[in-house]
């Protein structure tokens, strides 16, 4: 008997059921092949609009809304007019490389949601302020800005135009092309009115130029808005080398911060965020902002509190902090030095013994001081005793206890003495300690 041939796919087909079962099954609902369709619908729903297309859609919607408001007037007359962002021309590319330019509005909203008021006036104790003024430099050096240095270089070029300058004395600055001057004068107009939005491309390429200081001088940094200063700090901190970033901090950012505090008795939120953003390069921040502020001898209590709050809130590498503490401990004393040292000590770093020795010598230098030391000085000494009492040698502890006798404070000196006497010196072996 020949073999019965089965066609392809016949094995998967269902055999015919009896007629009664077919009639009963006909009344039931069958799912059919809807599963595949559902899978396709889910895949279609998961597709989303790309970020570039979303920005274009929002831009077109915003332009149409502005056209309607211009033709028919705003719907709500009682609402205050919305502050427009500075437009920099239609020719700028709308790619995703400039998304970070919108960072400031996000920061402002976050600050409002958190209830943080960086513009609140700093409360200063009058007694502490008078005590700090006693240790201020009576003949402070003249502060130099970027404009002063550029003008000095231009004057040198005019007086020595026919002289071939050696590598030691430097080189004369070249004349700028008139077209370049025209471009950056336009950038200056934008930065003087900048509130939010994207920055000109010509401004973003300044860190890559060899004569970036001269170009920056054309834009007149002293006339920038606070928001423009924040964006400039973000760009220069990210793209300049540490040495060049230090010059920008010292010649542009620091004078602006000090002038703003002196005028308004508080610091603008944009400038405060600029100081925090500058910590992207901690070495340049210490060399360009903190150390010059202490060396000036004119740092006020309000300036020290505001700048010191950034030290408290931000994470700083231990090597940079140790070097800064060593430098502050060895320089001439001013009241603000105690604030910065206390804040750095409160971060509880594992400091090298060289830094601890310099801090001890810093305090021992006041054994013959005739002026009344401020409370901030005693607080700094108390912080040193609390954080690093186990890292001090026996001779250092004895010298500090003698210092407390010469420079006493009715409330803080007993606490400092108790901290020093409760710890085992670092030069005493564990085996030599006897338990009573």
Curated annotation (Swiss-Prot):
Basic and acidic residues: compositionally biased ranges: 32-41, 70-86
Tissue/organ expression: High levels in preimplantation embryos, bone marrow, brain, testis and ovary.
UniProt GO cellular component terms: apical part of cell; chromosome; cytoplasm; nucleolus; nucleoplasm
Chain positions found as Phosphothreonine: 155
Highest taxon above the source species: Eukaryota
Main location, first listed in the record: cytoplasm
A Pfam family matched in the record: Bystin
Biological process annotations from GO: blastocyst formation; in utero embryonic development; maturation of SSU-rRNA from tricistronic rRNA transcript (SSU-rRNA, 5.8S rRNA, LSU-rRNA); stem cell proliferation; trophectodermal cell differentiation
Subcellular locations according to the entry: Cytoplasm; Nucleus, Nucleolus
Transmembrane segments: none
In-chain residues carrying the UniProt-annotated modification Phosphoserine: 54, 97, 166, 413
PANTHER family: BYSTIN (PTHR12821:SF0)
Quaternary data: Binds trophinin, tastin and cytokeratins.
Family: Belongs to the bystin family.
Biological function: Required for processing of 20S pre-rRNA precursor and biogenesis of 40S ribosomal subunits.
Name of the protein in its database record: Bystin
Taxonomic placement: Eukaryota, Metazoa, Chordata, Craniata, Vertebrata
Gene behind this protein: Bysl
